């Protein structure tokens, strides 16, 4: 009788156990290949439920408001230090992530997370310029500098056909680079200079866009964008699929640009930290890591992925820059509270005018 009761209780608990076998991932949209998710679900006998944020500022705001229920988060690395200090993350148990050995040394042990205590590299993007090659040729322009985004003399020819990222950190970084400063310059006077550069260029821009510029660039409605390398790659694919007469090209500004290394971290109150570790290790497998690059054209810090990446993508210098170009790339560093308040104030002034 006791055995029967135990069996009945066990059977009754199975639906609850199955219901709990859910990994909650908070990520950017379209930042993991669907087939990769399917493979993981099959391997772990679980479900992956994804929620999406448009940028790191939205992610931070949600966590600051007390959001819970997430297992894996995918922020940009320079935000990891602040997230850890805020108590939002738990350390990664590296004994459960043996595939960490696949990550190139250049992307490990960053100043944002020494020893990779809280984060594991996922993918990277480079913020650059994308453009409609047909329209740019017709206008007689050469796109090799941030002047294409900020110089009114050039923008006059592109009026209302340019979009810029709706990101205070990215747009200010581009303006600082244009002025000859580091993207991590902290001099308030230089920030004011960058603000003035942006305000002078703003009347010529069509919009600030965090998303949607891929489709507009592919459709030919927008001719030039300040955007991410993987988005520009996808816009070119879209233009080709639509059989457009133009191609969407990448342009690496000669002044340099931002390289954003995105990372996987585990939320402090993750309901399924065990699944989170399984997922992180799974994503560091060469084939699984390559799936993302092959789908969206993201940069890849995984040595084991290289043999699985499409040759035409691997050959693109905008996605896998050469050594000389790489020297001009910088990772953004997080701001302290005083700097963030000033940056927020400058951004409010930019958006209001």
Regions found by a protein language model. Give the residues of each.
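A ligand-binding cleft/hinge motif common to bilobed small-molecule-binding domains
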Residues: 79-82, 224-245
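Mature extracytoplasmic/periplasmic domains
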Residues: 267-328
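Extracytoplasmic ligand-binding site segments that recognize negatively charged/polar headgroups
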Residues: 76, 80, 84-204, 209-218
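N-terminal signal peptide c-region/cleavage motif recognized by signal peptidases
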Residues: 13-15
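Periplasmic-binding protein-like
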Residues: 102, 191-200, 206, 244-265
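Conserved C-terminal helix/tail region of periplasmic/extracytoplasmic solute-binding proteins
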Residues: 215, 323-353
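Early extracytoplasmic/lumenal segment of secretory-pathway proteins
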Residues: 19-83
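A bilobed periplasmic-binding-protein/Venus flytrap-type ligand-binding module shared by bacterial periplasmic
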Residues: 130-135, 177-180, 260-272, 291
């Amino acid at each position: 009788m006791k055995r029967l009761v135990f069996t009945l209780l066990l059977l009754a608990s199975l639906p609850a156990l199955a219901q709990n076998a859910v990994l909650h991932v908070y990520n950017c949209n379209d930042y993991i290949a669907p087939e990769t998710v399917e493979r993981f679900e099959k391997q772990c006998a679980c479900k992956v439920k994804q929620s999406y944020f448009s940028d790191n500022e939205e992610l931070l705001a949600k966590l600051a408001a007390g959001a819970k229920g997430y297992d894996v988060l995918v922020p940009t690395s320079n935000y990891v230090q602040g997230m850890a200090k805020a108590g939002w993350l738990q350390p990664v148990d590296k004994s459960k992530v043996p595939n960490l050995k696949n990550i190139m040394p250049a992307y490990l042990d960053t100043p944002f997370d020494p020893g990779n205590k809280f984060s594991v590299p996922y993918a990277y993007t480079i913020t650059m310029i994308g453009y409609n090659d047909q329209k740019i040729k017709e206008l007689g322009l050469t796109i090799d500098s941030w002047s294409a985004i900020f110089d009114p003399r050039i923008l006059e020819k592109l009026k209302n056909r340019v979009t810029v990222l709706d990101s205070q950190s990215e747009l200010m970084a581009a303006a600082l680079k244009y002025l000859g400063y580091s993207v991590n310059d902290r001099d308030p006077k230089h920030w004011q200079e960058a603000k003035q550069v942006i305000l002078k260029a703003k009347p010529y821009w069509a919009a600030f866009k965090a998303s949607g510029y891929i489709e507009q660039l592919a459709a030919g409605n927008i001719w030039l964008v300040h955007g991410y390398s993987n988005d520009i790659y996808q816009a070119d694919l879209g233009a080709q699929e639509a059989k457009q007469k133009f191609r969407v090209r990448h342009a690496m500004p000669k002044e340099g640009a931002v390289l954003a290394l995105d990372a996987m971290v585990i939320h402090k109150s993750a309901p399924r930290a065990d699944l989170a570790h399984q997922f992180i290790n799974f994503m560091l497998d060469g084939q699984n890591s390559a799936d993302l690059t092959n789908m969206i054209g993201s940069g890849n810090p995984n040595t084991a992925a290289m043999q699985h990446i499409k040759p035409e993508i691997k050959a693109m210098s905008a996605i896998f820059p050469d050594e000389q170009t790489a020297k001009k790339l910088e990772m953004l560093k997080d701001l302290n509270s005083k700097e963030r308040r000033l940056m927020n104030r400058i951004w409010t002034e930019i958006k209001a005018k």
